[in-house]
Amino acid sequence: CETDHIAAWKSSYSGVAKMGSKDKTFILSESGHIAGIINPPSKNKYGHYTNPETGLTADDWYASADKHEGSWWPRWDAWLSKKSGKMVAAREPGSDDYPVLAPAPGTYVKSK
């Protein structure tokens, strides 16, 4: 995210070069860590940048990137769908050896 205070985008971008796969895409979302990642597409709050060139400096990548309105989620969903298998039903939690302790989301999330 452009103004991310946890994972600076230029550092994240340089990390992509160290990934072995040639099938990789860097997408930069607008805003900060939470707002740029967590906001769902329905909020239509922030855009994102893409650039197929991967051998550039972070500044050059940004300068020549295309800006897109709306969430980066649909782009990620399309990428992930191409790499995923078919949808399967979720398993039923619990077993004789490991019974369910409480229904989701669990009691620990309500603890203070």
Predicted features and spans:
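C-terminal subdomain of alpha/beta-hydrolase-fold enzymes, centered on the catalytic histidine
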Residues: 1-112
